[in-house]
Structure formats: structure tokens, C-alpha cells
């Protein structure tokens, strides 16, 4: 796998991870419905900023560690694949469960600055997000990535995270898209679970190989 393909794979995997309904998703949805569209967009910016932090840590820390402990590279691929399969099974089981969001009739004016920090702190305090980033970067990034990847990945990660949650904010601040997603949630979640399972199996099956 070339470095360019690895970067693209990381971005796709992070996009799929961002789409998984979790604390970040619910927070953006609640702020968009219960406060305002501006608060939802500010929360999305906070999620993107948190993605930059996770991306930078994954790039620097994992690369340095894998340089000195090569067997850990294989172990992380197996662990990452197992975690992705675990996450996929949870998503599949919870696909039929509705997402609890705030009552849109209880809307009030919020602070965009506060919403931004809520998004940032929620992103950074979620251990599942940290594990997700570590798994994806360790599994897909080459052991000796080119210098340009350190420059382009953080801003691209920001656009992936912020871009997805901006879509969430825009959708949940309007009635029809919100109702459509809530009706289709079961099938959307199961499609995401299938894609994540395929990625997890690939990581485990290719773990004995050196490089990606």
C-alpha cells in the first residue's frame, strides 16, 4: 500500500468512525435541535479540533514507538482489528435502538463558544475515540511514513471530523432530514457495521505481514 493510499484509507476509516452514533453524535444533534444551528456548527468545530489533537498524537507517538518495537506493529494490527469487530457488533446490536435527543420545542439560545468547548472536551474525553485513532493509524499508516503525511493528515482529519458533524448539525436543525435519518437509522447503522467488520477482518488477516 502506498503512502497516498494509506492516507486515503485513514480518512475513510475516520469518516466511518465519525458516523457511528455515540456521545459526539448525540451532543451535536442535541445542540442543533435544543439550542440552535449555530450552536450545532460550533460543536462540530470543537469535534474537528479534537480530531487534530488525536491525529497529531497518533502520528507522533505511534510512529516513534513502532520504530523501536517492531513486533508491536503486528500486535496493534490484531488488537485494532479485534476492536473494530467489537465496535461493529455493538453497532449492529444497537441499530434498532432509537437515539434520544432533546425536545425541539424546548429550544433556547446558547453560547457558541460554550458549544465549541463542549464539542472539544467531549471528543478528547472519549476513550473510544482515542482507541479508534490509535487503531486506524497503527493499522494503515506505513512504518516509515513520508514527511508530507505529517503535514497533510492533521488538517485533513479536521475536515473529516468537522465536515461530518457539520452535516449532522445541518440535518438535525431541519425537520425533514432529521426525521428521515431517525427512520432509516437501523439500516444506516447496519451498513456501517458491515463496512467496519470488513476492515477489522482485513487488519487481523494481514497482521503477520510486515508493512501494509
Predicted feature locations:
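Membrane helix-loop-helix hairpins that form the core translocation module of multi-pass transporters
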Residues: 38-115, 201
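Juxtamembrane transmembrane-helix termini in multi-pass membrane transport proteins
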Residues: 2-74, 135-157, 166, 170, ...
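Kinked, hydrophobic transmembrane alpha-helices enriched for aromatic residues
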Residues: 125-138, 168, 199-202, 206
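Hydrophobic residues within alpha-helical transmembrane segments
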Residues: 12, 16, 41, 45-49, ...
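Short, flexible, glycine-rich and Lys/Arg-enriched loop motifs at helix boundaries
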Residues: 173-178
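Juxtamembrane cytosolic amphipathic helices that cap and anchor the N-termini
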Residues: 5, 110-115, 124-127
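Selective transmembrane alpha-helices of multi-pass membrane proteins
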Residues: 67-99, 160-168, 179-212
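Transmembrane helix irregularities
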Residues: 19-20, 124-125, 163
Amino acid at each position: 500500500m502506498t503512502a497516498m493510499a494509506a492516507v486515503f484509507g485513514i480518512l475513510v476509516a475516520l469518516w466511518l468512525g465519525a458516523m457511528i452514533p455515540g456521545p459526539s453524535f448525540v451532543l451535536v444533534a442535541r445542540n442543533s435541535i435544543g439550542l440552535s444551528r449555530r450552536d450545532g456548527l460550533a460543536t462540530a468545530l470543537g469535534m474537528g479540533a479534537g480530531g487534530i489533537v488525536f491525529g497529531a498524537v497518533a502520528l507522533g507517538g505511534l510512529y516513534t514507538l513502532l520504530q523501536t518495537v517492531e513486533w508491536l506493529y503486528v500486535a496493534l494490527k490484531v488488537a485494532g482489528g479485534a476492536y473494530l469487530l467489537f465496535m461493529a457488533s455493538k453497532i449492529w446490536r444497537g441499530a434498532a435502538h432509537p437515539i434520544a435527543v432533546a425536545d425541539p420545542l424546548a429550544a433556547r439560545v446558547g453560547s457558541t463558544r460554550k458549544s465549541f468547548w463542549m464539542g472539544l472536551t467531549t471528543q478528547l474525553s472519549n476513550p473510544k475515540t482515542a482507541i479508534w485513532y490509535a487503531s486506524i493509524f497503527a493499522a494503515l499508516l506505513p512504518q516509515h511514513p513520508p514527511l508530507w503525511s505529517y503535514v497533510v493528515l492533521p488538517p485533513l482529519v479536521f475536515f473529516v471530523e468537522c465536515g461530518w458533524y457539520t452535516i449532522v448539525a445541518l440535518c438535525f436543525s431541519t425537520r425533514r432530514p432529521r426525521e428521515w435519518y431517525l427512520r432509516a437509522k437501523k439500516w444506516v447503522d447496519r451498513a456501517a457495521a458491515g463496512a467496519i467488520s470488513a476492515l477489522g477482518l482485513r487488519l487481523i488477516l494481514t497482521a503477520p505481514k510486515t508493512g501494509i
